Amino acid sequence: MKLRQKFISVLVFFMASLLVGLSGLFLYLNPQIPDASTYQNVQIETPLRVLGQNGLLLAEFGERRSIPITLNEVPQHFIDAIINTEDKRFYEHRGIDFISLSNDLLSLVGDLITDRGLGSGASTITMQLARNISFNLERRFLRKFKEMLLALKIERELTKNEILTLYINLVPFGKRAYGAEAAAKTYYGKSLD
């Protein structure tokens, strides 16, 4: 009986400490998180395009190749592929997928014990969007919590379709191509549709 009481006392202390720690972390990080409403009308950076008299592209200047598109212009199979590879439960969570997060934490503990390195990131589409819009890409512990807080704010203020549209237009695909349309033109020389 004493062992059980001791276990319950330790568990209550641990849970209270965790709650106080998370509350303190929230109070510290929340003022650093931008307001999610600023992303409703985000301006997508497009390069300067020089066209010839015949209308063909001669040159492109700028750090990013971006061609903004609407969600209606994106083929459904591409949307399905993004959701299935990046965030299977995209329509079921509110910015943070706690199932994937807990699985990733267990995987991380296992990887640290066996010294295999770090596991996957457990980032949802909304968290990836938050990272690509607001935070630098350095791997820091606090950045992940900032992503989570901003993802929660984004999910409160934007619809899932608005989030997907921003993600499909802003995610880097390599070779300076930002967004799915720019990636299709960069890698395949044609439009998404």
Residue spans for each PLM region:
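Juxtamembrane regions of bacterial inner-membrane/periplasmic proteins
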Residues: 1-193
